[in-house]
Amino acid sequence: MGITKKPDLNDPVLRAKLAKGMGHNYYGEPAWPNDLLYIFPVVILGTIACNVGLAVLEPSMIGEPADPFATPLEILPEWYFFPVFQILRTVPNKLLGVLLMVSVPAGLLTVPFLENVNKFQNPFRRPVATTVFLVGTVVALWLGIGATLPIDKSLTLGL
């Protein structure tokens, strides 16, 4: 009981502060403007100063230095673009590849309208959304793994 600090509601000074709308803080110090205008900027600027100080004192290289005379055989995008890269690489017609990429968000936008009558949050009671998620995850992983392989060994999707 001695660890927790509870305000004495019988204290007339505290009752006067509560009547003025000063909040339930025992000291009567409101959050606005004290915390939001003075303490938060100090914490934010201190965090930024620590990050800048660490970056200046201990800079780390991001990979190895670039050599303009030695380019790789195949330039790969960042990891989150692997499925899109694989679609563009395997589909022979580039317009078809772009249409396939546009169809992914368009298909995801139709899922809420397919299950608008289903109000359950349990994924086992929402078969359409669960199936779309599982199939989309498997296809994205398959395309992502295929993008990391060389062109001659790449997963071609049967096209």
From Swiss-Prot:
Membrane topology: Multi-pass membrane protein
Listed Pfam families: Cytochrom_B_C
Any one biological process term the GO annotation gives: photosynthetic electron transport chain
Record bears the keyword DNA-binding: no
Subcellular location: Plastid, Chloroplast thylakoid membrane
Chain ranges passing through the membrane: 36-56, 95-115, 131-151
InterPro entries: Cyt_b/b6_C, Cyt_b/b6_C_sf, Cyt_b6/f_cplx_suIV, Cytochrome_b_C_euk/bac
GO molecular function: electron transporter, transferring electrons within cytochrome b6/f complex of photosystem II activity; electron transporter, transferring electrons within the cyclic electron transport pathway of photosynthesis activity; oxidoreductase activity
GO cellular component: chloroplast thylakoid membrane
Residues in the signal sequence: none
Alphabetically ordered keywords of this record: Chloroplast, Electron transport, Membrane, Photosynthesis, Plastid, Thylakoid, Transmembrane, Transmembrane helix, Transport
Subunit structure: The 4 large subunits of the cytochrome b6-f complex are cytochrome b6, subunit IV (17 kDa polypeptide, petD), cytochrome f and the Rieske protein, while the 4 small subunits are petG, petL, petM and petN. The complex functions as a dimer.
Family: Belongs to the cytochrome b family. PetD subfamily.
Function as written in the Swiss-Prot or TrEMBL entry: Component of the cytochrome b6-f complex, which mediates electron transfer between photosystem II (PSII) and photosystem I (PSI), cyclic electron flow around PSI, and state transitions.
The protein, known as: Cytochrome b6-f complex subunit 4
